[in-house]
Amino acid sequence: MKPRRPISFTREITAMEPSSTSVSRPEWRPEAQQTLTDYPGSRELQEFGIPQKQSLPNEATAQQGAEFQQEQGVQQSTLLQKLLTPLAFPVPQQSFPSHKVHSDQQEATSQNGPGAGKVHTTQKELEHRDEHVGTAESGPAEPPPATEVEATSIAQAVSGPDKKLPTQTDLVSQERAEQSDPTAQQTPLVQGVKSDQGSLIESGILARLQKLAIQQPSQEWKTFLDCVTESDMEKYLNSSSKSNPPEPSGGTVIPGTLPSKQKPDCGKMSGYGGKLPHGKKGILQKHKHYWDTASAFSHSMDLRTMTQSLVALAEDNMAFFSSQGPGETARRLSNVFAGVREQALGLEPTLGQLLGVAHHFDLDTETPANGYRSLVHTARCCLAHLLHKSRYVASNRRSIFFRASHNLAELEAYLAALTQLRALAYYAQRLLTINRPGVLFFEGDEGLSADFLQDYVTLHKGCFYGRCLGFQFTPAIRPFLQTLSIGLVSFGEHYKRNETGLSVTASSLFTGGRFAIDPELRGAEFERIIQNLDVHFWKAFWNITEIEVLSSLANMASTTVRVSRLLSLPPEAFEMPLTSDPKLTVTISPPLAHTGPGPVLARLISYDLREGQDSKMLNSLAKSEGPRLELRPRPQQAPRSRALVVHIHGGGFVAQTSKSHEPYLKNWAQELGVPIISIDYSLAPEAPFPRALEECFFAYCWAVKHCELLGSTGERICLAGDSAGGNLCITVSLRAAAYGVRVPDGIMAAYPVTTLQSSASPSRLLSLMDPLLPLSVLSKCVSAYSGTETEDHFDSDQKALGVMGLVQRDTSLFLRDLRLGASSWLNSFLELSGRKPHKTPLPATETLRPTDSGRLTESMRRSVSEAALAQPEGLLGTDSLKKLTIKDLSFKGNSEPSDSPEMSQSMETLGPSTPSDVNFFLRSGNSQEEAETRDDISPMDGIPRVRAAFPDGFHPRRSSQGVLHMPLYSSPIVKNPFMSPLLAPDVMLKTLPPVHLVACALDPMLDDSVMFARRLKDLGQPVTLKVVEDLPHGFLSLAALCRETRQAAELCVQRIRLILTPPAAPLT
């Protein structure tokens, strides 16, 4: 016979006629060892010792089979009632509506053949046993259906209240589908049902249920922890938001400009398409629920309630794990929760003080945004993540599926982040005591500012680039940031060896796997890169988007436009009329600084082909970008637009071109319906200030004079730019006013840099954790633009090679690294899986011998991360760096910076600092005692340092990386108003047109926008400031990534449209 396919133990065959002998009953299988996959609690059911039998064969009649299963169901239900009654498990007394299928019963009867009498003996035994059980037990005369009793009681005892059983309709539909299959009616005969089976089941269930009842958490904790479940989360947040409404004066939530955003609804967080259906959830969806819940907490709970809840949970978890014995994991978990409690209690009053004075630094009551608010908001996000993780631990710590090591790593990472945020809060307090009311930037003399920065930049940063990467941003942006960080550290591993070229990108593909699976390694390597690699590395990394393959993919996903042409503006002087007297003219000279006269590149983008854009003169200026095949028919030219947008791209003055920003510029051209010309200015450090300003001003004046060639009449002109481009937009307008020529009708600057001084501000403190704008990177870009960045020796070697030499060299390096990189990638993973336990590292005190130099110069040099993977087995029996605490990552290298040849080789690859660097760059500590000494005195002439007033017993974590290449003193040129417009005199700022600023609440450059808007407002200049929430610096380049970035980009379009709209005529 063909055996029927297995079914769930909750399957039922039901009937609704009183005369029928078939009632609700389960079908059991005799193989107790078989794993059930249809029901989540089947594994626990096997642990109870319940035998799971298969259904009877169809050799008996339908009525006899029904009687047998009815008696078996009655016996099982009566037994479970007896067991569950003393344990106070609720037994449902109502049944769901049942349905009968007559055709199925007739089919089952017709299929029964000879041999029906084989079940008489078993049936008599069951009847005898049923009578015995019925006389021995007391219960209702008509017990409820056995399946409902068993399923409900076992689900409550084993699965908990959060696991739901299949509905009755689903069971009936499944029964119909299986009964309609003729092969499903053939089952093997159950023989030899033992009469003592009931007693075995009784003892097994009773022992397991009593043990489970003892392990149930207390009722008060069950009530408190219910809010972390998916079904009750929304109700909790809604109730908390109603009971604890946010105070308007508190400003704990930075208001954005996106009205469709509803933070309290954690199911509608952006980037995931709204609420997920109840039921099956993948790992990604669970991860999303974790992030969304923490984000919802940070927006729905006030600071005091959040801190008190976190402290209560930390104390409970600490007491629990302290009582779990001398295990290493339990001890570390207890210490982590003790640290969480200490840091939360110490941070809460400081944040409250910052919130109490934050409103004095806002632009106005309609725009409550500044660095102090952003710092408090970031700390609240960290507290919210710790609160959610603590609740998860408290509710799952008794489960056999609780991953102690994973949760320990998460908690240690966020505890390190909370410790550093507490240090930033004290730094912000220090700024409050030094600065005047309403001033966000450090106002002390330059020596005090350098001393303040010197203490700040020594803080540990790696914890913010591992597991905690981007915790302050919207959940939809975090996967991108993780991908970016993995690519960055992989790219940085091979940059110094390969210098430049395609080989760096190819080699990084083989090493990114380690950083993807080990967040601690990624954070440590990220910190090493941002502190030691020069501006040429960032220029090479940011220019990856300029690769033809990536730019082509981006263009395929962007809007299709009729015109996208690169123009080369000739370096020829021309005349421009003065605005005060059009009869008079002024000569606009071509750019001359540093490199002499040269053409200026600009890209013309237009959604429609307009008059003038296909003229012979413009075609003569077009620069070829490679062959293109145009298959579409030549469109009819549209009339000239009344407006024109002149765009200046960002990139820290050192990287990117208009090609990188082309995707969102095409969208602008479509939505605005105007031509856009984007200027490709020369980049630093090869062309420092004022070369970029001269080229942008020259291109702007050329566009105003030749607007007819660009498809516009030039009635309304808008200057638009982001980041460094926003700075250039403002300075170009200042230069146009100084020349007396036409200034634009308005400026739209997105997250601009308005001062390039090395001054501390509350928002710039956030650069400690920002993956896109670390403080050292900002300093290197400023140094490159101001002309103080020195050129490395390998740059001169590249110039000597020439273009063809670079191509030949990069090709050979690519082929070599393709082979060696694959070998290194395979070896690194083979070492992880096949490393011998007796392998020991070099002793910490052993120095390198001269014979070891050959190994240090091998072509495939091992990095810091590879050396970390080769660490010996520790107390926990692991050989991976991710099992170490963040504290170990912070201080392990202080005592012995060269613990292994690989470490020494890595530092040698980065390039040690020369003695001349010591006077201008920070030293790295060699011991913990030296670090403590630096907290009290300055290394410069022994002058007492200006440092944050840390309370007794609090010591932030210091970086263990090498020399930080960041100048302590700003070059005097950065005070030039054409470089730092925030420092411009009032008479210059009064010449600016209306300025519309769009900033990010979590951007280190937020205070630049706030202070510049305050200055313009105090002068009576028209200015607007819009602040968007939860987005990083550079959201325009991420416009296609998620809903928030698209809405923020649309806000910039609205500001431009406002500028291009002619003012209404006054009423007469």
From Swiss-Prot:
Spans annotated as Disordered: 1-76, 91-195, 236-278, 836-862, 890-913
Reaction(s) catalysed (UniProt annotation): a diacylglycerol + H2O = a monoacylglycerol + a fatty acid + H(+); a triacylglycerol + H2O = a diacylglycerol + a fatty acid + H(+); a monoacylglycerol + H2O = glycerol + a fatty acid + H(+); Hydrolyzes glycerol monoesters of long-chain fatty acids
Active site: S723, D1003, H1033
Posttranslational mods: Phosphorylation by AMPK reduces its translocation towards the lipid droplets.
Positions of post-translational Phosphoserine modification: S863, S865, S906, S927, S938, S959, S960
EC number: 3.1.1.79, 3.1.1.23
GO biological process annotation, one example: female pregnancy
Biased composition (Low complexity): 59-76
Family: Belongs to the 'GDXG' lipolytic enzyme family.
Name of the protein described by the UniProt record: Hormone-sensitive lipase
Species of the source: Rattus norvegicus
Name of the gene encoding the protein in the UniProt record: Lipe
